[in-house]
């Protein structure tokens, strides 16, 4: 089960990539592979490149045909409800799950509009239980709250989202059987160049 960046990694893992392959992929990926900047209109990033990248990596395998069961979480911005993608286009589901409000343009699928799943379910422990998981291992990658004044629009958005995620995550993490907390809290959501450091951790 993956939310936001977790859905990105989760989709690749569910397709069959092992930890070594995922690490190699993360080191080789460039911003230009997944980030398509656009004139701000509900977001700075379109998300089309991310969708295409995921579909290419999973050989266009739909969610329901993954080697390992996989579920991506997004938020229906119209109703505020948690949406679980359990079938269909994997790249589209991951794009919807990763659509950080104000950064990515919201993802429209079948008349509904979706944003980042972390808005309502940053860790998705309850979803994992609902879909039959006996043991839930959660990964907490929340950033340390920055006490500095944000520099610019993107910093303001990301800092606000980090605060929101931290508040919601704490309750969900308490319901996991095991919580892994890699020391990556000092790495901001937009610090793509620090991915090597995050992987080593």
Locate predicted features.
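Patatin-like phospholipase
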Residues: 1-3, 11-201
């Amino acid at each position: 089960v993956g939310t936001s960046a977790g859905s990105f990694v989760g989709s690749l893992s569910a397709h069959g990539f092992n930890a070594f392959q995922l690490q190699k992929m993360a080191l080789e990926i460039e911003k230009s592979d997944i980030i398509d900047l656009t004139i701000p209109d509900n977001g700075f990033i379109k998300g089309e490149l991310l969708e295409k990248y995921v579909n290419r990596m999973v050989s266009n395998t739909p969610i329901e045909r993954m080697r390992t069961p996989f579920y991506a979480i997004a938020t229906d911005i119209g109703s505020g409800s948690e949406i679980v993608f359990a079938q269909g286009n994997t790249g589209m589901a991951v794009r919807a799950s990763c659509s950080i409000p104000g950064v990515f343009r919201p993802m429209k699928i079948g008349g509904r509009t979706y944003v980042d799943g972390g808005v309502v379910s940053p860790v998705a422990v309850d979803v994992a239980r609902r879909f039959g998981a006996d043991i839930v291992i959660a990964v907490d990658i929340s950033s340390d709250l920055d006490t500095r004044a944000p520099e610019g629009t993107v910093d303001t958005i990301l800092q606000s989202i980090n605060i929101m995620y931290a508040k919601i995550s704490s309750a969900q993490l308490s319901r996991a059987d095991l919580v892994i907390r890699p020391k990556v809290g000092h790495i901001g959501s937009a610090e793509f160049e620090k991915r090597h450091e995050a992987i080593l951790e």
